[in-house]
A protein has these predicted regions:
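Substrate-binding groove/exosite segments of carbohydrate-active enzymes
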Residues: 2-102, 171-173
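Beta-strand segments within the central parallel beta-sheet cores of soluble alpha/beta enzyme folds
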Residues: 62-66, 115-122
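The feature captures the catalytic groove of carbohydrate-active enzymes
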Residues: 75-96, 102-119, 126-177
Length: 177
C-alpha cells in the first residue's frame, strides 16, 4: 500500500520507495536516478541506509544487501563487472558497502549486523590486504592508494574523451578518512 502524503516524513518515505527496483522477484536494488541512471554501486551503498533504515524498513536494506553481496563477491573472485550493478569495480564501492553495513549496525544493533555481515566484511578486508583490487593498493603505511591519472576512480568521475576531467591519484582523502 502506498504511504499517504500527510506529513513531510511520509513524503520522504514515498520518494525513497520510488527508487526501489526489482527486475526479478529475488533481487532488490536502488536506482541511482530517473530516467538516465540505472543501478550504480556507489550510489546504491550511499543511499541504502537513508532509503531503507531511516524509513523503518530494515528488511528492504537486508534484501538489497543480499543482492549486492554476491555481486561484490563475484567481482572480487573474477574481476568481472556485474550486469545489473554498474561501476562495482570502483575502489570506493567496497568502502561504501562497509559504511552501509555500519549504519545497519547503528540502527539494528551490533549482534544482528554481525550475524549478517561480519564474515563478508572480513572478506573485503582480506581482499585489500592481499592487494587484489586492480585499482587500489593498501600501502605499508596503512593507507589506501589509487592511480587515477588515466581512469576516473572516485566520485569525481567526469570524463572527456575517456580521460578524467579531474585526475585523482595518490592517497585520496575520502578513501582514507
Amino acid at each position: 500500500a502506498r504511504t499517504p502524503r500527510i506529513s513531510f516524513y511520509n513524503c520522504l518515505k514515498n520518494s525513497a520507495q520510488q527508487f526501489y527496483f526489482r527486475p526479478k522477484e529475488e533481487d532488490a536494488y536502488l536506482l541511482a536516478g530517473y530516467p538516465w541512471f540505472k543501478v550504480r554501486a556507489r550510489d546504491l551503498f550511499i543511499s541504502m541506509p537513508g532509503c531503507t533504515l531511516s524509513i523503518e524498513d530494515p528488511v528492504r536494506f537486508e534484501k538489497i544487501m543480499h543482492t549486492a553481496i554476491p555481486a561484490i563477491r563475484s567481482f572480487m573472485q573474477t574481476g568481472k563487472a556485474d550486469e545489473e550493478i554498474r561501476e562495482i569495480e570502483n575502489p570506493d564501492v567496497f568502502l561504501w558497502d562497509i559504511w552501509a553495513m555500519q549504519q545497519h549496525s547503528r540502527k539494528m544493533g551490533v549482534e544482528k549486523s554481525k550475524e549478517l555481515y561480519f564474515n563478508f566484511i572480513g572478506e573485503i578486508i582480506t581482499y585489500f590486504r592481499e592487494q587484489k583490487h586492480p585499482d587500489m593498493k593498501l600501502m605499508e603505511n596503512g593507507l589506501l592508494f589509487v592511480e587515477g591519472r588515466n581512469k576516473a576512480l572516485t566520485w569525481m568521475n567526469s570524463t572527456v574523451d575517456g580521460k578524467p576531467v579531474v585526475s585523482r591519484s595518490g592517497y585520496i582523502v575520502e578513501f582514507n578518512a
